[in-house]
Amino acid sequence: MNTCAFLLILAVQIHADSVEGPTAGCTFDEDSDPSLCEFSQGEEDDFDWQLFRAHASPHSTSDLLRGSYMMVNSSQHAAGQRAQLLLQTLSENDTHCVQFSYFLYSRDGHSPGALRVYVRVNGGPLGIPVWNVSGSRGRQWHQVELAVSTFWPNEYQILLEATVDRKGYIAVDDILLLNYPCYKAPHFSRLGDVEVNAGQNATFQCVAAGRPSEAEKFLLERHNGEVSSGGSVKHLGRNRFAVSFQLEDVQKPEQDLYRCVTQSSRGSGVSNFAELIVKVPPSPIAPPQLLRAGSTYLIIQLNTNSILGDGPIIRREIEYRASLAPWSEILGVNMVTYKLWHLDPDTEYHISVLLTRPGEGGTGPPGPPLISRTKCAEPMRALRGLRASEIQSRQLTLQWEVPAFNLTRCHTYSVSLCYRYTTAGGGGGHNTTVRECLAVEHNTSRFTLRDLPPFHTIQIRLALANTEGKKEGKEVMFQTEEDIPGGIAPESLTFTPLEDMIFLKWEEPVEPNGLITQYEISYQSIESSDPGINVPGPRRTVSKLKNETYHMFSNLHPGTTYLISVRARTAKGFGQTALTEITTNISAPTFDYGDMPSPLSETENTITVLLRPAQGRGAPVSTYQVVVEEEAGRKVKRELGIQDCFPIPTSHGEAQARGAPHYYTAELPPSSLSEATPFTVGDNHTYNGYWNSPLDPRKNYLVYFQAMSNFRGETRINCIRIARKAACKDHQRALEVTQRSEEMGLILGVCAGGLVVLILLLGAIIIIIKKGRDYYSYSYYPRKPGNMNKTPITYRQEKSNMMGSMERSFTDQSTLQEDERMALSFMDTHTCSTRSDPRSSMNESSSLLGGSPRRQCGRKGSPYHTGQLHPAVRVADLLQHINQMKTAEGYGFKQEYESFFDGWDINKKKDKTKGRHDTLMGYDRHRVKLHPLLGDPNSDYINANYIDGYHRSNHFIATQGPKQETVYDFWRMVWQENCFSIVMITKLVEVGRVKCCKYWPDESEMYGDIKITLLKTETLAEYTVRTFALERRGYSAKHEVCQFHFTSWPEHGVPYHATGLLAFIRRVKTSTPLDAGPVVVHCSVGAGRTGCYIVLDVMLDMAECEGVVDIYNCVKTLCSRRINMIQTEEQYIFIHDAILEACLCGETAIPVNEFALAYKEMLRVDSQSNSSQLREEFQTLNSVTPHLDVEECSIALLPRNREKNRSMDVLPPDRALAFLVTTEGESNNYINAALMDSFHRPAAFIVTPHPLPGTTSDFWRLVFDYGCTSVVMLNQLNQSNSAWPCVQYWPEPGLQQYGPMQVEFLSMSADEDIITRLFRVKNVTRLQEGQLVVCQFQFLRWSAYRDVPDSKKAFLNLLASVQKWQRECGEGRTVVHCLNGGGRSGTYCASNILMEMIQYQNIVDVFYAVKTLRNAKPNMVETLEQYRFCYELVLEYLDCLEVR
C-alpha cells in the first residue's frame, strides 16, 4: 500500500441494523477507505512514522509482523529522537472507547524505545502521557483501551509518540473508535468544578465506572502538565469507585483546569477538565471611619464600599482591641454604623473590619485599622487614704493611695492638694483664711507642704481632676507642731511711765506658733538725768505667766531711761525679742524737814524762817519760791506734809487785784541755798521780781517753801508749810463771821438746784414708761406662748425707735410716690431696721417655721391693719383666707392682683442697652449705683435695685440675669456690695431662648479686673450650689461668693409644689453670714420669679416672728422699689400656697448629732392628746399630700391603657409619666411608671408596679429607653394577694426576646437577703444603639403581708449594694418596683434619699424626703409603719457609722 495518508479516525456512521462494532477507525489495510482514516505527522518531532505493509516493503525482515500498520524503526534513528502521530480531533456526545494495538520488539531483548499516548483537549497543552509503555514486549500485538470522558462541545485529540532508545521496532495498528464503553479502562463521570477560598483545601472527587486493577495508577493532572498522585480510592459498588484528590492550602496561583487519569498496562481512563476556582476572601481597602467618641464608647462607620478580594460579602464583623492589650474581640455587625460599648476611658483602640464571603475560610484578613482613643471619663471617686507620714512645725509630709487608672479614668489627669487654715488678724483685726491649691506631680502619692504656720489646724482636701470632671475628697484635719513663737509686735507694747514705776502691757505674738507657756521681761537703766544714778545699771529679768500680758515695774529711778525687752516662750523655746525704751517721769524735789520748824523770830509784820535746800529726784532743783497764803476760810489738812502747791506765779499785786489768797513773796536761785539759810518773810525787799511785802497784822498767814525742778519741758513742784503767823484777835473774829455767811449761801444754792433736777428726771421717766406701755401692749392678733424669746427692750432702744419714727414722720412726703409712702408705712409697721440695729435672737426649737436660729425678730410689731383695706392675715387663719380668695365670686385673687397696677408709670428709662426689658427698668431712687470706672462717668449704671428684707434694709438686690455686655458690671456690683449669696432662678436657655448668659467660669476666668475661680460645685436634684473665690486687681482681699442656682422652676408657669423652693430658701438663709452684704436675686428680667423669692423670704420671717403674714402689702412695697415684681396672678397665688405649705409643715430637718434624742422625743406619747409627735407629723404629711384628680391622670385612664394598669386605684399623674421611646408594632408609649427625684439627681428613680404578663415587653423597653442599670424588686413572685399573678419577667438561664428587646441572662449570685442577677439588654431593631448591662436586685426579706422589711440591716445591705453597682456602671437610673409601685417602692426611694442627706449634709429630714416623693405620686410610703421604719432605718445606719 503506497497511500501516504489514511483516515485514522472515521466519521461517525449510523448503521441501520444497530450492530455494535467500530464506528470509525484505521486498520491501515489496503482496502480501507482512505477518506475515513485521517492522521497527520507531528511538526515538532524529529522524524515521521512510517506506514508499513509487509508484502510491499523492501525492508521486510523476519522481525516484523505481517500486515499493514504504522511503524518506527528505531535502528534508523538516534536514541532520544521522537516521532509524533496526531489523530483526528474528536467531539463526542456519548460514552465511547478508543482502542488500538501496538508492539515493541527488539531482537536482543532490549527496549527499542517507548510509546506514549497524549490526550490534548481544546487545542491546549499536551500535558502528561495518559498511557505509556516501554521495553521489548515480544513479537506480538497488544491491545490498549482509552476511555476519554471529554464530550461536546469540548473536543480532544489523541497524539501517539514514539521515542527511540535502541535497535528494534515500535508499531501501532487497528486504531478504532467504539460506541460502547471500554472493557479494560474505567470511564470517569463528569468531573465538576471546585470552588474554594484561598488557603483552604480543595478536593477533586473522580467517580468512575469499571473495575480498577491492583496495578492501576490514579493521577490528577493540571492543565499545565503538573501531576498529583496519591488519590484515595473508595469503592461505591460492584462496578463503581471514586478517587479523591486533595490539594492543600490552595492559593490564587493554583487556580487552573484539572482532570483525573488512570493508568494501567491495559489502557487509561481520562476525565474531562474541571476548573479549580480559588476565591480570595475580601478585605476592606480603607479603615473604618470614626463618627463620634465618648468616654466608654466609639461610634464608627464600617466604610466597606471598596474591597480587595472576591465577593459576595455575606457577613461583616468588627475586630477591636486596646493598643497594648494581648486580647481582641470580634463582634458581628448588620448595619453600616456600629457603637462599641463598655470601653475603657482614655484608651487607644485598634478597630478593623472583617468581611466574609461564602465557604469555609471565607473570612478575609482584617482591613486597615482605625486607631482611635476614647475620651476621658469623670474620675470614679476622690482619692482616699490621706494621712501624714511626717509632721513638723512648718511642714507636713502627706501620703495617699496611688491614683490608679480605674480611679483617674484618664491618662491625663491632675491631682490637686488644696489646704486652708485660719490665722488670727493682728491688732484685733478679723481672722484671715488662707486657701491654696497645689498641683501634685503625676504618678506620685506623696507631697510635702511647706511654709505652714506652726501649731495650726490645716484642713486638707485632695482633688482628682481630668478634662471631664473633678472629684474632691473630704477634708482631713492635721495640726502642725509647735515652734518658737514669733516676736511680739512692737506696736502692741503700751506703757504708762510714772516717777518710780512703769506699767507695761503687750499683746500675744501675732504668730504664737504654739501654746504660750510664759513671758520673759528684761529691763536695764541706760540713761538718767539724775547725776546721782549710775548708768548703765544691772540687767534684771522677770518671768510672767502665760495669761499675764502686763507688768508693773517698781522701785525705779525717776528721770531714768530703761531698755525693756519682752519675749514669749512655747514648749519649743523663746521667740524673738521686742525692745522698747521707756523713761520714767522726774519726781518732785524732797525737803529735809522733820516736824514743822519754829520760826526763828516774829514781829507784827514779819516772820523769819529757816530755809533748807531741797533734794532733786531725777532732775536738779531749778528754783525756790517762798509763798504766803492768807489763812482766812481755809482748814488745815495736816500740820506738816505736802500741801496743794502753787505752780502759777502770782505776785503780791496780782493777788490783791484778783483777790487771790496767796502770792509769791520771793523767788530764790538754787545757788543761794547751798545750805540752810534764814529768811525773813515781809522784809519789804524784792527777790527776783517778787515783792516781799510786809504782813498785815490783822490776818492769819501760812508760809510755804516751794522747790521746782524742770527737765525737758517737764516740771515737778513740791512745797511744804514751814510757818504760821497768827493775826490779832479782833481782826480774826470779824473774818470768821464773814466766812460763815458765805458758806451758808453756797449750801442753800446747791440744795435748790438738786431738787429741780430730781423733779425733771422723774417726770421724763414717767412719760417714757407710759408711751412704751401704749406702744407695745397692743396686740392685734394673739400670739402662741413660747414661740419667741422675749428680749426686754432697754430705755436706749425705746428712745432710738421713737426718735426714728419721729424723724420719719417729718420726711417730705410730697417727694414720695403713693406706693413709696405706702411702702414706708409698711416698713415702719413691721419695724424694718438697718443691719447695724440691735436684734434679739430666735429660739430654734420653738420657732414657728423652723427658720435659721440666727434670725433676729426684734419686737413683735403690730400688723398693718388700722383703717386698711388689706390687713395682715394670721397664720392660723391663712388656710381659710386662701380658700375664700380662691372661691370668691366678687373679690378674689384676680382682683387683688390687678389692683397692683393702678396708676403705675415709668418716668425714667435709661441705659436700654443694659436692660433686658424696656418696661422693667428699676426705679432710679433705689437703684444700685456702681462706682464709676476711670474716664467713664456713665459706668455707674446697672439694672438692679435695693429691696428691703424683714428687719433688714437693702437686704436684697433684685437684678436681671446678666447679658454678655453686663457680666463685668454684675461682678463689680457683687464685689462693691460685699455680697456673699447669689440666687439664680432661671435656666440659661428656656423654650429655645437665652434667658441668662453663663456669667461664671468652669474653672477660672478674668472678667475685667476681677478674677473668678470656681472652688466647688454641689449638685442636688432641684438646685446647684457653686462656690467662687473673687480677686480684684489692686486689692489684697479675697471674697468668697456662693451661687444658689434653682433649676426646678418650670419653663412655663410656677412650680407644681413649693417643697423644693422652700428647702432652697432655707438653704440660702442658713448659708448666708449675718455680716454679709445684700443677697443678689435674679431670674431673667429680675421680676416675677425674683419677686416670688423675695416675698417668700420676707413673709416666712414675718410669719415666724409675728405669727401673721402681710403678702399684699409686701408685694406692693416691692413694686415701689422695682416695677412688676410679681408678673402673673398665678405667681401671686403660688406665693400664698407656698407660705401655707411652710406654715403647715414647718421645719422638719434634724442634725445628725441630735437625731437619736429627737427621735426618742418624737415617740413620746402626750398624755393629753394620747398621740406622739411622730403620728402627728405623719397626719400632717397626709393632709398636705396632693390628691390626684381625674384630669391629672388622663393618659393612664385612656381606654387603650386600662389593661396596662395593675390597679385603677394607683395611677401615675401625667406630669410624672415615663413615656416609652422604642416602638413595638401597634403598641403605644404608655407604661404605668413615674419618674422620681433622688436627693442629688432629678428623675433618678422610676417607680412602677410588678410587670403584668402583657406588659413585660413594655417593662424592658422602659429599662432600655431610660438607661436603667439597676432594677430593685421588692416583692416576691406569685404573691397570693395580687389581683393578677406576679410572673417572672426575665430569662433564667439563656436568652429571650420580649418584643424588640433581647434580654440575655449573664450570671446570678445570692445570699440570704438578696438575689443579684446580671442581664444584657439590646434592641434588636436598632443594634447601633448598643447594649445595656442591667443588674437586678431581688430583696428576699420583705414578707408578703408585712408593711415593713423583716430586717433593717438587710435593707441597708440592699441600699449599699445598689449604690455600689450604680457607682461602678456610671450612675444610670434605677427602676424600683413592688406589687403596686407604692408603699414599698416609696420606702426604698425615701431611704435612699435619707442616706444621701446624711452623707452630704449631715441632716435627716424624713418628712421632706417622703413629701418630695408624694409630690410626684401620692401613694409613696403609704402607712405610718413605713414612715416610722424610715426613722428607725436612719437610727440603725447611724449606729453602723459609729461602729465603723
UniProtKB/Swiss-Prot annotation:
Residues 1-16 form the signal peptide. It catalyses: O-phospho-L-tyrosyl-[protein] + H2O = L-tyrosyl-[protein] + phosphate. It is a single-pass type I membrane protein. GO terms for cellular component: anchoring junction; membrane; plasma membrane. Residues 17-748 are extracellular. Disulfide bonds join 206-260. Its main location: other. One of its GO terms (molecular function) is protein tyrosine phosphatase activity. It is found in: Cell junction; Cell membrane. Substrate binds at residues 1051, 1083-1089, 1127. SUPFAM superfamilies: (Phosphotyrosine protein) phosphatases II (SSF52799), Concanavalin A-like lectins/glucanases (SSF49899), Fibronectin type III (SSF49265), Immunoglobulin (SSF48726). PROSITE patterns: FN3, MAM_1, MAM_2, TYR_PHOSPHATASE_1, TYR_PHOSPHATASE_2, TYR_PHOSPHATASE_PTP. One of its GO terms (biological process) is signal transduction. Residues 284-379, 382-483, 489-590, 597-677 form the Fibronectin type-III domain. Its EC number is 3.1.3.48. Glycans are attached at residues 73, 406, 684. CDD domains: FN3 (cd00063), MAM (cd06263), R-PTPc-U-1 (cd14632), R-PTPc-U-2 (cd14637). Pfam families: fn3 (PF00041), Fn3_PTPRU (PF23144), MAM (PF00629), Y_phosphatase (PF00102). Keywords: Cell adhesion, Cell junction, Cell membrane, Developmental protein, Differentiation, Disulfide bond, Glycoprotein, Hydrolase, Immunoglobulin domain, Membrane, Protein phosphatase, Receptor, Repeat, Signal, Transmembrane, Transmembrane helix. InterPro entries: ConA-like_dom_sf (IPR013320), FN3_dom (IPR003961), FN3_sf (IPR036116), Ig-like_dom_sf (IPR036179), Ig-like_fold (IPR013783), Ig_sub (IPR003599), MAM_dom (IPR000998), Prot-tyrosine_phosphatase-like (IPR029021). Residues 186-271 form the Ig-like C2-type domain. Residues 24-184 form the MAM domain. Embryos lacking ptpru display severe disruption of their segmental pattern and loss of cyclic gene expression in the presomitic mesoderm. Convergent extension during gastrulation is also affected. Tyrosine-protein phosphatase which dephosphorylates CTNNB1. May function in cell proliferation and migration and play a role in the maintenance of epithelial integrity. Functions in somitogenesis. Functions as a regulator of the biochemical clock responsible for the segmentation of the presomitic mesoderm. Belongs to the protein-tyrosine phosphatase family. Receptor class 2B subfamily. This is Receptor-type tyrosine-protein phosphatase U. It comes from Danio rerio.
